[in-house]
């Protein structure tokens, strides 16, 4: 399998580029580039294990995607094999390449269009100075308003993460990160640049978060303290697993200014379904990861959890967001795709898939819902006895 294609083919420090096979672990790229003072910016929580090929398939982000972008913004080129066995080289190390941007199309296509066999990524110089701020709040809505306040000041942190009370307590007990367990929410805000820039930004950010209700602000400037703060965040998912036998991780995006309202609505859904929710997410770019806690051994809880998760994603669409940020669609979110896209848009997805993979060999049944499925959900209706786009597969 592709997991065995795990070689770093070249590190070019002069041009800040790495060429790797798809099975190379995300973190391994930064480890290999560290000797040159470089690193690869996208850093999903699973970076110790996830592969760069998987990152391309899902267009993964991570803590630092707010400032440095998603996978699509950091991949310069890919070599891809089509379902017909043809080899395509898309993108490259030049500033711009002519023709349509097929590289961007491949990023996030979930393996439905081609098989990536090689990836060229850009590397960045490590910033000269970094500070990580922990801001604690007595209300999660206040933390949400603080996020909008910081971005509204024109400040783009390297990373901006939020955790609610359940997540904070679980992570602190698991990782001993120094989180205040009495907080209803915390923000972790990373700032980077020159020493003078970081000091000036830290003062501005502290002022904004305090104006929005932060009762405790700690700033870590040494590497060990920063690592300890981030360890808690990156351990949050396994830590939350200690609170219940099972959890269901959602992944949706919303406009930042809707953050406080959406968190309040998620709290209302949690009460309605009597299912606890731990919120751990990339607050800076509005990428939510509500973790619904449940016990699959209790009759009806799994079904209730899936229904509640679907309603959270539909809420994201309702406020102008999307049903996925970085975890993809697969089969899990096919129903919600019918909510976000209409039949005309789905038609274009089908035609694109058919152009790349006419026999439907690559990851079939994923990513794009059939029109019949959407019809059953009420997302598409028969008009005067005729179905739209009759040339497309109904199943």
PLM region descriptions:
Residues 281, 322-329, 364-367:
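Short acidic/histidine-rich active-site segments
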Residues 344-395:
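Intrinsic disorder at enzyme termini
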